[in-house]
Amino acid sequence: MIKSIPIPTAGVSLGLAALGNLLQPYSPLMKYTCGILAAILLAMLLIKILRYPKLVHADMTGNPILGSVAATFFMTTMQLCVYIKDFAPFLCEAIWLAAVAAHAILIIWFSKNFMLNLELKNVFPTFFIAYVGIVVASVTAPAFGYFTLGYYIFWFGF
């Protein structure tokens, strides 16, 4: 089952994490329900990445859509770190910083692999996810006190 989980599952997880944040003022229970579901999906994808790295690498390098959508993994991680930062602040901050750095590395990797020899027929709307998605870091940065970093990331993504 784990082997067949698609990379875009991270996008569903991101949607759930964002929905939970949206519902927080109305129902803390719904916030954490969405967060738990998002974390379960993300954990399943992480297990796939760890158990089948060659398969994931082949998916990402062979398909620019999957390569760009992979950024949602790091975007979700940033959001979920804010969910649980009150329980493990130092760990969450470290994971958040790692997710921001990994997203930046993904931008470089994606640019190198899919943007250097770009042809219009191979351009897809998902390309924006790789570049603009890092703005999630600017939204979540204040939770960890990284206001300046969040400011610059916002303008990069804008």
Place the predicted regions along the sequence by residue.
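Juxtamembrane helix-loop boundaries in multi-pass membrane proteins
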Residues: 1-20, 53-81, 96, 114-139, ...
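Functionally constrained cores in energy, signaling, and assembly domains
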Residues: 26, 51, 79, 103, ...
